[in-house]
Amino acid sequence: PCSELIIGMKCGGSDGLSGITANPTVGIFSDLLIAQDGTTILTEVPEMFGAETLLMNRCENEEIFEQTVCLINDFKEYFTSHHQTIYENPSPGNKKGGISTLEDKSLGCTQKSGSAPVRGCLLMERQ
């Protein structure tokens, strides 16, 4: 049954067309699976930087909203604590393929999550 499926969605290399082709298609799949009690997980938190509010606006409740904010902020803090720039995305390959800004890439990432409510947030543990 679909309720036993858990699908993780990862960036496979974005270009100028993925935001109008593959990513929306994956989002539709995500919505269909969730409608059948399946689960999808949007991975690669740094890929969300720049479009995270789209996910936050879909959080099912205040607790999940706060967890999502915490997840994003923890990743940003991790980057800055290691002297890494947060907004050094997209990659040269993304740019060559037609993506010019972080927001372009991030919008593509969040499209893969579809439009269903965000019902959970897996927080990362630091070691």
Regions found by a protein language model. Give the residues of each.
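Active-site cavity-forming subdomains of large catalytic enzyme subunits
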Residues: 1
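Anaerobic metallocofactor- and corrinoid-dependent redox/one-carbon enzyme cores
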Residues: 4, 9, 15-127
